Amino acid sequence: MAAQKTKKKYVVTLNDVSGTLDNDLFKKMASKGDITSVSVTEVVYQTITVTGTAYATIETDEKTFKMSYFNTEEYGIIHCGGGTLFDESLGDYMADGVTKFRINSVKCKLGTGYKAVPILE
């Protein structure tokens, strides 16, 4: 007799979505835990054009955490933890209408952080 699989908890709650991520397909992907994205750490020193954002709370059996998703023209969806330096810097400049950024790494007390630097055109 086969061992019975236990279902692990993975619940994604979208707190806020905008732009190209504000659609039924992305919401369905989130509800199924099926968002495939690239970590911001994998695109350091690259330029991104942000077309949509989503802020989520994710609950698992072990923990609850926040995640931020950004749809980009260049890399598709990228992600970072909610409330990080990257998340805060990108959100701050997007509030001013900026959509094009360079991702830089910066030295912090606890190691390396990532920051969204607006591209002035």
Predicted features and spans:
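Short, charged beta-turn/beta-strand-edge "cap" motif at the junction between a beta-strand
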Residues: 96, 104-121
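GIY-YIG-like beta-to-alpha core
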Residues: 76-88
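OB-fold ssDNA-binding interfaces and closely related basic DNA-contact patches used
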Residues: 1-74, 110-111, 119-121
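Arginine residue identity/basic-tract feature
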Residues: 7-9, 100-102, 115
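Short nucleic-acid-contacting surface segments enriched for D/E, G, S/T with interspersed K/R
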Residues: 38-43, 85-104
